[in-house]
């Protein structure tokens, strides 16, 4: 009997993908560019266009970066799907991380390929200092990266514990 692979976590990619594109669609339909609605004293919904990557990285270049980011999203997503296929479904943290990164990367890629930019709208600030505006796909990618770090930490801790148990058994 073969064990279930990590591919069963791709539903999480689909959820991140659909929720991101749906929220971007709503923002584009309901907001004018740069329109901002105050939600909390430290949070606005603000429609902006990001022509670069995270934190508008490479946004001021001549347009080649759009193709670079599309290829990068496809390459990373392909690699992570391969990792999911190789993983056992019981590796829940790592599989969830990969799936969230895939969903976020592909959603931003579709937005970039269709529009030539990525729609961002979550705007957190304090006084006059604004954090870079971001979207659901960015959140999915960041949560995925955080889960990978957590998984690596847990795996390293388990290795240390296993070595300690092994040493105790040799005495």
Curated annotation (Swiss-Prot):
Transmembrane regions: 8-28, 64-84, 99-119, 133-153
Catalytic residues, chain numbering: 120, 138
Compartments where located: Cell inner membrane
UniProt catalytic activity: Release of signal peptides from bacterial membrane prolipoproteins. Hydrolyzes -Xaa-Yaa-Zaa-|-(S,diacylglyceryl)Cys-, in which Xaa is hydrophobic (preferably Leu), and Yaa (Ala or Ser) and Zaa (Gly or Ala) have small, neutral side chains
GO biological process: proteolysis
Keyword Transmembrane tagged: yes
Its membrane topology: Multi-pass membrane protein
Domain of life: Bacteria
EC number(s) per entry: 3.4.23.36
Alphabetical UniProt keywords: Aspartyl protease, Cell inner membrane, Cell membrane, Hydrolase, Membrane, Protease, Transmembrane, Transmembrane helix
EC top class, as a word: hydrolase
Family under the similarity heading: Belongs to the peptidase A8 family.
Protein name per the record: Lipoprotein signal peptidase
Species this protein is from: Haemophilus influenzae (strain PittGG)
Source species taxonomy: Bacteria, Pseudomonadati, Pseudomonadota, Gammaproteobacteria, Pasteurellales
């Amino acid at each position: 009997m073969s064990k279930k692979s990590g591919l069963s976590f791709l539903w999480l990619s689909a959820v991140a993908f659909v929720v991101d594109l749906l929220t971007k669609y709503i923002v584009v339909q309901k907001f004018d560019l740069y329109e901002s609605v105050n939600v909390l004293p430290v949070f606005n919904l603000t429609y902006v266009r990001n022509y670069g990557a995270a934190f508008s990285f490479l946004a001021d270049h001549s347009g080649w970066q759009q193709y670079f980011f599309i290829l990068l999203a496809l390459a990373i997503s392909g690699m992570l799907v391969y990792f999911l296929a190789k993983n056992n479904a019981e590796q829940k943290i790592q599989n969830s991380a990969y799936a969230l990164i895939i969903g976020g990367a592909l959603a931003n890629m579709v937005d970039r390929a269709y529009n030539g930019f990525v729609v961002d709208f979550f705007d957190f600030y304090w006084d006059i200092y604004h954090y870079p505006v971001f979207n659901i796909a960015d959140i999915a990618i960041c949560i995925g990266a955080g889960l990978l770090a957590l998984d690596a930490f847990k795996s390293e801790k388990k290795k240390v514990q296993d070595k300690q148990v092994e040493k105790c058994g040799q005495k």
